[in-house]
């Protein structure tokens, strides 16, 4: 019997109906490789293998061994590459699509890693509902939402109750999808025009991410007050105020009220 490890944030999805909904939610992959983070008990992995070749990253050696045992009992061959590695260091040479029931405690980091990886062309992932809502809200209420919509098209799909897992978490989970959008990627890469496209895209995303950390450092304070405290941007405060004037926005505007962060950041970086 496999016992979930709290240290790895393990909650195994066991409800067949939700497993099937996840597989059905996958968009056409075309020539993209399918990458899974976390093999768990292998239930989702086996359903995916019924349709696609698959590479799975799993840090827990006991779960890897359990998956190998399950595969031996299957009546048909499956095309699975089981990488016994930490997914925080996921690196692929070819374009791929990511799917996962992510561990709560590192879910945000893994999603952001996928956003900034040019080889990742999209993701279908489950996180704590609160985290999913932060990524999927359509306005600029938080930095995660701005980052998600800056890189692709974002869709909140469905909620998953605690009863669908073993052991049951204390909160609801949600499944959401992000499909990378080439025009949005081009806009991000244009922030750093001196590099190759993939390098510029990654660096552009990281530049926006760092800028947003400064902008949203104290969400209830004004944007200008937050940037005054930033080592990187406090010297650009006059340009921020110039931008707000050009956009007919008051100097008292908060970070959540900025409509176009890429436009603001480009303005600050030029000249």
From Swiss-Prot:
EC number: 2.1.1.182
Highest taxon, organism lineage: Bacteria
GO molecular function annotation: 16S rRNA (adenine(1518)-N(6)/adenine(1519)-N(6))-dimethyltransferase activity; RNA binding
Catalytically driven reaction(s): adenosine(1518)/adenosine(1519) in 16S rRNA + 4 S-adenosyl-L-methionine = N(6)-dimethyladenosine(1518)/N(6)-dimethyladenosine(1519) in 16S rRNA + 4 S-adenosyl-L-homocysteine + 4 H(+)
HAMAP family to which the protein is assigned, alphabetical: 16SrRNA_methyltr_A (MF_00607)
Similarity comment text for this entry: Belongs to the class I-like SAM-binding methyltransferase superfamily. rRNA adenine N(6)-methyltransferase family. RsmA subfamily.
Protein name: Ribosomal RNA small subunit methyltransferase A
Organism: Helicobacter acinonychis (strain Sheeba)
